[in-house]
Amino acid sequence: RGLHSEIDTEVEEKLYRQLHSFFGTSSYFVQGGPPLDEEAIGVIKQILSSGEYADVFKQCQGDGLMLRGMQVSFDWIKERAPQALAALPESGDSLEWSAPVKADFPYHSDGKYGKISSWTPQFNSARRFATTWSANNPVDALPCIIQTSCETGTFLDTEPFARYIGGVYAKDFGIKKLNPQGNREVEYLLFGDCQVIGIQLVGDK
């Protein structure tokens, strides 16, 4: 079965295959453009706006807090949230995270996955992404966690997609599980932009 027994169409087949590619492909291996093209993103946004298939396409609503762990340059922080740098202790445990500092700047999803970025409500998951080394990180990379409210953007819960296994897509396309990462962590996808309301850094001045 596809995402919904009533919408197994050519568009839905394309969406299923692209979602699997999105969930199952590390950023290191993304080539030839984002896994989800503009048509697929448009379909997802349309479904979220309509409220249809809400058992699968679940959107974070209201003032729910979302976190994103990243490694960014010193200048990135200085330009957007210098108050976060000023709030760091003069000295101390270099592995200790600061308390969240209020911030107010837009975050634009823009990378190998296109206009989509990964967020989570779980601090430990965000911290792991913020402290994981990557060849794409800036030379002067600083681990940081930015915070936003669900009401400032379009956030899609990825967990419901984990229940889709086997079926015609496994037989015809070798897709055994739509979202191979679905049960490992709580992940939401931000489509487009949001407004950052808080930021945390690790370390001291």
Model-inferred region functions:
Residues R1-S117, F123-K205:
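Conserved NAD+-utilizing ADP-ribose enzyme module
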